[in-house]
Curated annotation (Swiss-Prot):
Residues at which Ca(2+) 1 binds: E17
Modified residues (4-hydroxyproline): P9
SMART domains per the UniProt record, alphabetical: GLA
Record's subcellular location: Secreted
Name of the gene encoding the protein in the UniProt record: BGLAP
Gene Ontology CC annotation, any one: extracellular region
Main location group: secreted
Official protein name in the record: Osteocalcin
Limits of the Gla domain: 1-47
Role noted for this protein: The carboxylated form is one of the main organic components of the bone matrix, which constitutes 1-2% of the total bone protein: it acts as a negative regulator of bone formation and is required to limit bone formation without impairing bone resorption or mineralization. The carboxylated form binds strongly to apatite and calcium. The uncarboxylated form acts as a hormone secreted by osteoblasts, which regulates different cellular processes, such as energy metabolism, male fertility and brain development. Regulates of energy metabolism by acting as a hormone favoring pancreatic beta-cell proliferation, insulin secretion and sensitivity and energy expenditure.
Binding site for Ca(2+) 2: E21, E24
Annotated source species: Oryctolagus cuniculus (Rabbit)
S-S bridge residues: C23-C29
Family, as annotated: Belongs to the osteocalcin/matrix Gla protein family.
Residues that bind Ca(2+) 3: E24, D30
Length: 49
């Protein structure tokens, strides 16, 4: 059963989700994240995760 039209809830909150959203807004960070992973890409652009 869907709740609030959001689909199934995540089994646990993703602590990196806010950083993922920031990185996705930067095309260079987003592209790098596809290659090396979110944490490494985020660190290169924005500092420690």
């Amino acid at each position: 059963q869907l709740i609030n039209g959001q689909g199934a809830p995540a089994p646990y909150p993703d602590p990196l989700e806010p950083k993922r959203e920031v990185c996705e807004l930067n095309p260079d960070c987003d592209e790098l994240a596809d290659q090396v992973g979110l944490q490494d890409a985020y660190q290169r652009f924005y500092g420690p995760v």
